[in-house]
Amino acid sequence: MNTLAVKSIALPAPRPAINQGIDINNEMVLSHTAIYADCLAQVTQENTVENALMVLNPYGTAPLSAYAGVWSLEPAEILVTVQDVAKTAMPVEHLYSLTTGENLLPVLGLVADTENRIVFSQADTPLAAYTLTTQPLPPVDSADVVLGFPIINVTQPAIDADKMAPGFYFITHFDRYNYALDQNGLVRWYVTQDYPSYNFVRIDNGHFLTTSEAKNTYLDMYEFDMMGRLYTFYNLDNQFHHSIWPWDSNTIVAPSEYTSGRPDDLKTNEDGVSVVDLTSGLETAYYDMAKVLDTTRVSRPSGTAPGEAPTVKDWLHINQSYVNETNQLLIASGRHQSAVFGVDLQTQALRFILSTHEDWDDAYQPYLLTPVDSEGVALYDFSKQEDIDAADHDFWTWGQHNVVEIANDAPGMVEFMVFDNGNYRSRDDSKSLLPPDNYSRIVHFVVNINEMTVMRPFEYGKELGARGYSSCVSAKAIQQNGNIVVHFADCTFDENGRAISCQPGESDIIDSQAGSEAMGLLILQEIAPTEKTVLFEATMTSGYYKNAEKNGEGYRYDITSFRVYKMDLYA
């Protein structure tokens, strides 16, 4: 976790709080607290390891999770192993340290729609076994079901397990479900739609923070655990519409806005970044990017996301922000400017812009980065139109998401990896790419803010072509062993299998050959970056075509994913 003490530096002032804070009277929090207390109270001296109290899905929100209530006469270690009775799934193990008296142990990784065997053992000796029968997964999309559970298919099995990063693939679909897959593509955890699914991150205590469009348009933030227990409910004055980033154990950073209208004459949204103290739920700093960048520069891509008022200008659309401590910068991604930029953490002064050099006002020219090779030699001559076009098509990011820091402690150096969606790949319609001719990719950038240059040591995604083209959202996560988990998470196709865009005319040029129906077929991969070897691949789909007549104008947003991680079930 980050080492810079948040309170040791002077950040910009927060906005005045209206209703923001922790709702200590939230009914769901109070109910879950009572359920936990009741489960714990039921554990008596009779509930030894050989006679444990087993409670499946105690909160009604995590159907593949259970509690094991165990009374211990002394401190001891116990290994809990979970597997389906038929032994078709990989076992999930966790070593617990029991305390004297009652213990309530989360049992995670159950398999849906079958009998599960939970074995307690010590020193390789089984002590007791229990059986829990789980319900089927929720229904998938159909004429009667919208926002159903995804259909998951493994398209490349994990045949070289030794090269895989440990853990489970955690995925969140827009207003559908948060869930986790094992490396065989089997669902081993999910929470019900009582919780937001979209803006989803695990914090230091092992809990998750989430917001979504479906839950009061990103104004309700939930903190819950793998058992589906809600711990804290936050009321937000302004939307947390994208990418919550944990700064430290008690502080988060997230894109925000003036949801009820700006205090000036601008009619804009999604153009700020908020810092919030989790212990109080209050904002401690706010960065207003309308005072940093040019609000009049034409957006590309553009558009209005579901739930946004069309009369409000989404000129920047910040979808990711984080703190670079080495250089004391706030780094942010502005999708609608196709720009990643850095501002001074204390003064908000602009430090750099990673973007095509086209159409920026003269005042911003000094902040634009020059692409160079590994020797520092410029890759393009921007006095030539052909070089401008080449950089647009091959170097710069377009409509990017998920800017994630790569550690670099050298002063003046900023490294990150970004998901380059690739919308248009030009500011000129005549030079832009249609979705069937386009691609999305992940890109590693190294920014030298002393020299104002940027280098690109790695990219991946062109190999998939239009199969991986995602006109919005998507994510990736770098693993401890160097592997990269990447989710091409808005791959959408018409009834003829042609790649299409989420908002033609705004997210891409209009494709006259596109059909009238849409269905998502998202790609999850784990790759070894050195060889760009695909170690595992699975797809997620709704399995059900949507169209404007039956599903409304947003039908092309069939199924999307905003975040992907690979981590342990047990935090």
Q: Residues of each region from the PLM?
A:
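RTX-like calcium-binding, glycine/aspartate-rich low-complexity repeat tracts
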Residues: 1
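Histidine-/acidic-rich catalytic cores in large beta-rich domains
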Residues: 6-85, 96, 100-104, 108-115, ...
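Solvent-exposed beta-strand/loop surfaces of large extracellular or lumenal domains
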Residues: 90-96
